[in-house]
Amino acid sequence: MISLGHLLALGAVLFCISLAGIFLNRKNVIVLLMSIELMLLAVNVNFIAFSRQLGDTAGQLFVFFILTVAAAEAAIGLAILVTLFRTHHTINVAEVDALKG
């Protein structure tokens, strides 16, 4: 059986990896979106760990809501990415610095 400490450590490691992905690679939109999704999954691991430790299902239900919002966020982010690539022919954030209609 996995202890609470191990699950929290896993969540912290995933969160730190996602922070490193955001800070080390700010130019690529795909890496930024993947890092944000990994950050949300790290938070979900912590919710599941505490929910399991306390014997309450509220944390597990909250994770389902977070996953739903994360899926919608990923769909909107990918739609923006496709539009960005079609108009500017790049996915580099540094090259796209102006919002034009």
Swiss-Prot record:
It comes from the Bacteria. GO terms for cellular component: NADH dehydrogenase complex; plasma membrane. Pfam families: Oxidored_q2 (PF00420). Its EC number is 7.1.1.-. GO terms for molecular function: NADH:ubiquinone reductase (non-electrogenic) activity; quinone binding. Keywords: Cell inner membrane, Cell membrane, Membrane, NAD, Quinone, Translocase, Transmembrane, Transmembrane helix, Transport, Ubiquinone. It catalyses: a quinone + NADH + 5 H(+)(in) = a quinol + NAD(+) + 4 H(+)(out). Its main location: membrane. It is a multi-pass membrane protein. It is found in: Cell inner membrane. One of its GO terms (biological process) is ATP synthesis coupled electron transport. The chain crosses the membrane at residues 4-24, 30-50, 62-82. Belongs to the complex I subunit 4L family. NDH-1 shuttles electrons from NADH, via FMN and iron-sulfur (Fe-S) centers, to quinones in the respiratory chain. The immediate electron acceptor for the enzyme in this species is believed to be ubiquinone. Couples the redox reaction to proton translocation (for every two electrons transferred, four hydrogen ions are translocated across the cytoplasmic membrane), and thus conserves the redox energy in a proton gradient. NDH-1 is composed of 14 different subunits. Subunits NuoA, H, J, K, L, M, N constitute the membrane sector of the complex. This is NADH-quinone oxidoreductase subunit K. It comes from Xylella fastidiosa (strain Temecula1 / ATCC 700964). The gene is nuoK.
